[in-house]
Amino acid sequence: MKLKSLLLRYYPPGIMLEYEKHGELKTKSIDLLDLGPSTDVSALVEEIQKAEPLLTASRTEQVKLLIQRLQEKLGQNSNHTFYLFKVLKAHILPLTNVALNKSGSCFITGSYDRTCKLWDTASGEELNTLEGHRNVVYAIAFNNPYGDKIATGSFDKTCKLWSVETGKCYHTFRGHTAEIVCLSFNPQSTLVATGSMDTTAKLWDIQNGEEVYTLRGHSAEIISLSFNTSGDRIITGSFDHTVVVWDADTGRKVNILIGHCAEISSASFNWDCSLILTGSMDKTCKLWDATNGKCVATLTGHDDEILDSCFDYTGKLIATASADGTARIFSAATRKCIAKLEGHEGEISKISFNPQGNHLLTGSSDKTARIWDAQTGQCLQVLEGHTDEIFSCAFNYKGNIVITGSKDNTCRIWR
C-alpha cells in the first residue's frame, strides 16, 4: 500500500487518504469528530499515526498542518450576520421545496407549475427550467457532493434525473403507482431512492436508468427516506408509525423500528451510522441503535407534533422542531435537553444545523426564519420579510448563505 495524497474534509472534520493497493486507487477517511479549538494537535497526530500505518513519520508535519487548518475552520462564521441579498419570484404557482448544491453556488426550486428551476445564488439569475413532469414537482435534490445531477420526484408518479450543466433529462424512472413525495441520492451518487404514497420505496440505477429494487413492507405512505454515510443502509419513515432499515446492496429488510404511536415525520442517521433519529406526530423523537434496531432513548418535552428533527454533522447534538412553536436541542450522549428555542409565533416545520454545528436555522408558519446559537439556544437573528409561511430553509456547506422558501411564492437569498 502506498499513500498518494491527503485531502481535507471540513465538515465534519476529517482527513481523506488516497492510496494505491495492488495498482488500484482507493480512499479511506479518518473522522475527527471530537476535534475542538483546544485539542492538542501533536497528541492527536501521534494517536492517528499509531492507528493508521499509511501515515508514516515523514508525514507528521503535513498531518499537523492539515489538522490545524481544520481547527481554524471550526470557529468560522460564528459572528456572521445575514442580510437579505435577493428576492426571487421563482414560479407562478406555489413552491414545494428548495435545495442547495454543496458549495452553495446554485440552488433548485420545485413547484406546482410542474417544473424545477435552477438558479445562480450569486446573481439570483435563473440558469435553467427543467420541464417534462405532468404534475406537481414535489421532491428535489442535488447529488451532493458532486452536484452535477438533479433528481425530481413528482405527483405524476415518476422521478426524473437531469444534468445540471445542460438541463437535459437523462432518465425518467417509472414504476410507482402513486405520488413521489421524498427522494435521496446515495453518497456515491450511483443510486437514487424514491419514496411514494403507494407505500413503497424504489432504488434506481443512475447509470442505466433501471429499477434496482422495490422496498416493500410499509402499510402506509412513505414520507421520509435517507441513506447512511457509507451508503449501505437506507431508512424509510412512514405514516404507518414505523421506520424500516434496509440493506441498500440487497434491498432486504434489516430492522423495523417499532415504538412510535403516530405518523413518522422525519428519520435520519448520525454521521458514524451508529444511531437513527426519528421524529413523530406523537410529540416525541426516538433514538435507535442502528445495528440492532432497539430504541435507546425517547426525547420528550414538546406539547405538539414533531415536524422535523436532525443531528448536527458530528452527531453530538440533536435538534427537534415542533408544531408547538418551539425547537429543542438535545445531547446525543446524555439524551438530555440542553436548550429550548423560544420565539416563533407559529409551528416550526424545518430545522437544520449549519455545517460548523454552532448555529441552527428554523423556518416557521409565522413567516420568519431564525438563526440560533446551538450551545445556548439564544436567538441570534430573525430573518423577516416573507408574507406567508416558510416551509423550506437551508444553509450552504460553508454556512455563510441561507435560502428560504415560502408559500408567498418567493425564495429569498440571505448572505
UniProtKB/Swiss-Prot annotation:
Single Gene Ontology BP annotation: determination of left/right symmetry
Pfam families in the cross-refs: WD40
Major subcellular site: cytoplasm
Disulfide bond residue pairs: none
Subcellular location: Cytoplasm, Cytoskeleton, Flagellum basal body; Cytoplasm, Cytoskeleton, Flagellum axoneme
Family annotation (SMART domains): WD40
Signal peptide interval: none
Regions crossing the membrane: none
Resulting phenotype, residue 129 to M: In a breast cancer sample; somatic mutation
Keywords: Cell projection, Ciliopathy, Cilium, Cytoplasm, Cytoskeleton, Disease variant, Flagellum, Primary ciliary dyskinesia, Repeat, WD repeat
WD repeat residues: 90-129, 132-174, 175-214, 217-256, 259-298, 301-340, 343-384, 386-415
GO terms under cellular component: ciliary basal body; cilium; cytoplasm; extracellular region; motile cilium; SCF ubiquitin ligase complex
InterPro entries for this protein: G-protein_beta_WD-40_rep (IPR020472), WD40/YVTN_repeat-like_dom_sf (IPR015943), WD40_repeat_CS (IPR019775), WD40_repeat_dom_sf (IPR036322), WD40_rpt (IPR001680)
Keyword Cytoplasm attributed: yes
Gene Ontology MF terms in the entry: ubiquitin-like ligase-substrate adaptor activity
Pathology linked to this chain's protein: Ciliary dyskinesia, primary, 52: A form of primary ciliary dyskinesia, a disorder characterized by abnormalities of motile cilia. Respiratory infections leading to chronic inflammation and bronchiectasis are recurrent, due to defects in the respiratory cilia. CILD52 is an autosomal recessive form characterized by laterality defects, and mild respiratory symptoms.
Function: Required for axonemal dynein assembly and ciliary motility in ciliated organs, including Kupffer's vesicle, during embryogenesis. Facilitates the onset of robust cilia motility during development.
Subunit structure: Interacts with IFT46.
Annotated family: Belongs to the WD repeat WDR69 family.
The protein, known as: Dynein assembly factor with WD repeat domains 1
Originating gene: DAW1
